């Protein structure tokens, strides 16, 4: 029986993870749950799952949860703050950690799981975007196992030979006959909207994704295609690709989740309904297969499958991310920080939709100008850079 810590338990990925665990209750025990500040949802999860441990990033929320659990005679030990999340990520009795905390906040807890040599189900793409080689080196150093949860990276993973699956971050695609990886994306809700109308997009419009059910931040990132840009950076690290080996393709139907092209002309594609329970189940039981609760794909009802080149004038954030990927670690760390700040401001109705790109570009340019030669050889140096980039973004936001 696998014993799990679920980081980001109250979010979309966390909920899907627990759904898969419930489908296969004889195979999984939920030992610990971690979240940010959603006390009510966390209380409900603790009532249902009776975990030994829980952790809340917000100390006040942790205290409220502790009181609520105690008054209901639930014996779950509650930890607080980033330290609490790191603690439940490295518990001796846990062998598998679902890393699903959104954004930079997930970096340290995820790295704690890596340093404890756990099986990491990586849904937090920002951890790799922010730390890159440092993360990959830590996985090897501490004997952790890395399995990608993002639907696209999981699709690529499934289309690659086991010898690559077992050596993520250090694989040689060329030696295994792989010519290129095709990273697919739906293009979001505005792929056919007139570009001149994007300035009027509201948060409500941006979070209404046509295919996937996701949280607000990732939904906005999908609308700008920054999400695909971050996934591009993650794929570069996971699969050790060159620029020539990694391509982005718009696929509006979200049926093919990504593809791998081989030198002999073969293309392997992973297909399925757009439901995160599929890649989650794949990683939770790897290398076995278990039920995810997702309906099988009915090919008679799919209709057409279409593919388009990405238009960078429509998706400038995608171009920013791809450029940052080849500019160095300072660029990807800085861009991720800027994007988190600008998307939060957009969701709070403080800036417009097209301002997101403008803020991201300003911060990226400033970070590249000031920190190009900065030695980023520790988590502390990355976190310092992340903080400085957020300060740059906050300054830029005040001028909008």
Swiss-Prot record:
GO terms for molecular function: 1-deoxy-D-xylulose-5-phosphate reductoisomerase activity; manganese ion binding; NADPH binding. The keyword Transmembrane does not apply. InterPro entries: DXP_reductoisomerase (IPR003821), DXP_reductoisomerase_C (IPR013644), DXP_reductoisomerase_N (IPR013512), DXPR_C (IPR026877), DXPR_C_sf (IPR036169), NAD(P)-bd_dom_sf (IPR036291). Keywords: Isoprene biosynthesis, Manganese, Metal-binding, NADP, Oxidoreductase. Gene3D superfamilies: 1.10.1740.10, NAD(P)-binding Rossmann-like Domain. Its cofactor is Mg(2+); Mn(2+). The keyword Glycosyltransferase does not apply. Signal peptide: none annotated. Its EC number is 1.1.1.267. Mn(2+) binds at residues 150, 152, 231. 1-deoxy-D-xylulose 5-phosphate binds at residues 125, 151-152, 186, 209, 222, 227-228, 231. It comes from the Bacteria. Transmembrane segments: none annotated. NADPH binds at residues 10-13, 36, 38, 124, 126, 215. SUPFAM superfamilies: 1-deoxy-D-xylulose-5-phosphate reductoisomerase, C-terminal domain (SSF69055), Glyceraldehyde-3-phosphate dehydrogenase-like, C-terminal domain (SSF55347), NAD(P)-binding Rossmann-fold domains (SSF51735). One of its GO terms (biological process) is isopentenyl diphosphate biosynthetic process, methylerythritol 4-phosphate pathway involved in terpenoid biosynthetic process. Pathway: Isoprenoid biosynthesis; isopentenyl diphosphate biosynthesis via DXP pathway; isopentenyl diphosphate from 1-deoxy-D-xylulose 5-phosphate: step 1/6. It is an enzyme of class 1 (oxidoreductase). It catalyses: 2-C-methyl-D-erythritol 4-phosphate + NADP(+) = 1-deoxy-D-xylulose 5-phosphate + NADPH + H(+). Catalyzes the NADPH-dependent rearrangement and reduction of 1-deoxy-D-xylulose-5-phosphate (DXP) to 2-C-methyl-D-erythritol 4-phosphate (MEP). NCBIfam families: Dxr (TIGR00243), PRK05447.1-1 (NF003938), PRK12464.1 (NF009114). Belongs to the DXR family. This is 1-deoxy-D-xylulose 5-phosphate reductoisomerase. It comes from Aliivibrio salmonicida (strain LFI1238). The gene is dxr.
